[in-house]
């Protein structure tokens, strides 16, 4: 069962995903139906990420600004908000306050 605060009956990959010299660290969570998510933290910084699959980024805590590939507009997101990123694209993220996030691969 999944609630607003936790994921139940899942497997977690023990080894962390560490990117950008430790500025972004996440763990992969595997669900019984075959889907996966990552739970992570990004420290205050400016980064550029690439995606393979479409992603839904849910902000649990913190604050960031995001600019999707091909857009000139920055959007600001905080706790309780989310944004979608198309597959096979890139996005810029400027983390203003340490970001706690859940990333769903769609």
From Swiss-Prot:
The gene is ppnP. GO terms for cellular component: cytosol. Keywords: Glycosyltransferase, Transferase. PANTHER family: PYRIMIDINE/PURINE NUCLEOSIDE PHOSPHORYLASE, PYRIMIDINE_PURINE NUCLEOSIDE PHOSPHORYLASE. InterPro entries: Ppnp, RmlC-like_jellyroll, RmlC_Cupin_sf. The keyword Transferase applies. SUPFAM superfamilies: RmlC-like cupins (SSF51182). Catalyzes the phosphorolysis of diverse nucleosides, yielding D-ribose 1-phosphate and the respective free bases. Can use uridine, adenosine, guanosine, cytidine, thymidine, inosine and xanthosine as substrates. Also catalyzes the reverse reactions. This is Pyrimidine/purine nucleoside phosphorylase. GO terms for molecular function: guanosine phosphorylase activity; purine-nucleoside phosphorylase activity; thymidine phosphorylase activity; uridine phosphorylase activity. Belongs to the nucleoside phosphorylase PpnP family. It catalyses: a purine D-ribonucleoside + phosphate = a purine nucleobase + alpha-D-ribose 1-phosphate; adenosine + phosphate = alpha-D-ribose 1-phosphate + adenine; cytidine + phosphate = cytosine + alpha-D-ribose 1-phosphate; guanosine + phosphate = alpha-D-ribose 1-phosphate + guanine. Its EC number is 2.4.2.1, 2.4.2.2.
């Amino acid at each position: 069962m999944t609630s607003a605060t936790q994921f139940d009956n899942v497997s977690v990959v023990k080894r962390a995903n560490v990117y950008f010299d430790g500025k972004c660290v996440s763990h992969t969570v595997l669900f019984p139906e075959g889907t996966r998510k990552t739970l992570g933290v990004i420290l205050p910084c400016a980064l550029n990420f690439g995606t393979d699959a479409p992603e839904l980024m849910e902000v649990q805590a913190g604050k960031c600004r995001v600019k999707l590939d091909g857009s000139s507009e920055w959007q600001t997101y905080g706790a309780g908000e989310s944004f979608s990123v198309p597959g096979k694209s890139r996005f810029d993220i400027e983390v203003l306050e340490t970001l706690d996030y859940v990333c769903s691969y769609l």
